[in-house]
Structure formats: structure tokens, C-alpha cells
Amino acid sequence: MSALRCSVCSAPLHPDGRSLRCVRRHSFDLAKQGYVNLLRAGVDAGTADTSEMAAARADFLATGRYAPLVDVLARVVEASGEPEFVVDAGAGTGYYLAGVLDRVASAWGLALDVSAPALRRAAKAHPRIGAVVWNLWEPWPVADGVADVVLDVFAPRNTAEFHRVLRPGGLLAVATPGAGHLRELVTELGLLDIAGDKTDRIAESLGDHFEPVDVDTASHTAELDADEVRKLVLMGPNAHHLHRGGLGAKLDALTGATEVTFEFDVSVLRRKE
């Protein structure tokens, strides 16, 4: 991973046995699960996905309910030409990045996420993924102008770092829930509501560094059994709010099947020179 930089001094990192090391001898051990933690300090409780959330996400995404979103993201990466390096900011378990790399044989991927439990899975999700524990709100340990595409799927958006790590003319794909996403569960279970007009606000917030290219939407409905609904809820931010409105009790009481809408918006933007 020659694109990685030391999180202490910003010098290039190079493999040294089971570690990554810079010329100033700052060293970071590779975990046996295949990822590296470059954080300099601990993370506040609640900001990272837990082991339980990562497990629920892996199980639910394996059902293929979010495969249409992978298709959209893969088309964006393919449209960038012959990409060599894709950064997934907030990669989680690596599901989306692995799906993209399956379609784009020329590319390697870097999964950045603050959750070590999630990155244990991301590191094994695809042979061309490198996984790094990092807080996306901090300057990333990645060299300038090395990425052909940056993916941001339901994750924090650090505009300055998007711009810095992308090559001139590189593409940014920001995936957000559509207005109808999980609407049945929002009504039935009282999930956190989905904000409207996100795509307009994304283009506006990134406008100083990026120009809009396209907005693509993928939507479908599927019948989920009670266990699938539980995993769907527990893999995301609602897992931090199980006591809100008795959500945990409502999940425990679920029986039968529920028709659920899945809707994803992908805003594609190009890095300004």
C-alpha cells in the first residue's frame, strides 16, 4: 500500500515484516486479521460500529438486498476510465468495495473505517483490499492525488480530504438513503427518519471542491422475515438507539414478513482542478 502515509509525521509507510514503518521509525503493527490501525489516540465510545453491528451488517448484506447499490457504484468506478486505486471512506465490512473490485479488475482498494471489528471483515472481503482503522474527520493517512475514485456510502463526508486524495478529475460517489428508504420500518418501528433533499444539499456542500456529474437512484422492494428486519435495523445507527421509543422491544416482538422499500441515491461529482 504505497499510498499510505505515517499518521505521526506523514512520511511514506513501507512494509517491514508484520509492520508498516516510515523512515523516522514510526511503526504500526499489522493485526493478524489483516488490517492496520493507524489511529494515534482512542475513539470516543459510540462513534465506531460494534462487533454486533458488524456481524448484523455482514449477515444482512449477504442476502443481496443492497446489490443494486453495488451495481451503481461499480458503474461509477468503471466510468472513471481504467482506475488503479479506489478509496472507500467509511467502508465498514468492505461489502461495497469488494463488489466494485469484482467488476473492476484493474483496481486496488483501500478501506478506511473507525471500526476495527468491521475492518476485520473488510480485510478478508477481497484480495485487493487494504484495510486501515482511521477517523475520517482527521486528515487521512493517504498521499495526495493518488485515488481515481473515492466512495462514501452512508458515511461521514470530509470534503477537504476527498479533494486532497483524489487525482485531478477524479470521481467522488456519495451514496445516501433515498426519501423512501425503509419507509415501512420508519412507520412501524419508529426508526430514525430519512432526511429529504439530500442530493441537493450534497452538491451544495461539496461545491467549492467538486462539480456535479450525475445523480443515480436505485430502488426496489423485498419481503423480509423478522430475523432479516432485526439484522437490518441492528447493522446501522438505529442500533445505538434501541431504547428510543421502545425499539428494542418492538424488534423482539416481530413475527411474520414485512414488505420493505430500499431506495439509494448516488451523487457523482468530479474533483475540480
Predicted features and spans:
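A short glycine-rich, Lys/Arg-flanked "PGG" loop and its adjoining helix->strand segment in the class I
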Residues: 159-171
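N-terminal auxiliary segments of SAM/dcSAM-dependent transferases
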Residues: 1-47
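Conserved class I S-adenosyl-L-methionine
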Residues: 171-201
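Class I SAM-dependent methyltransferase Rossmann-like catalytic core
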Residues: 46-72
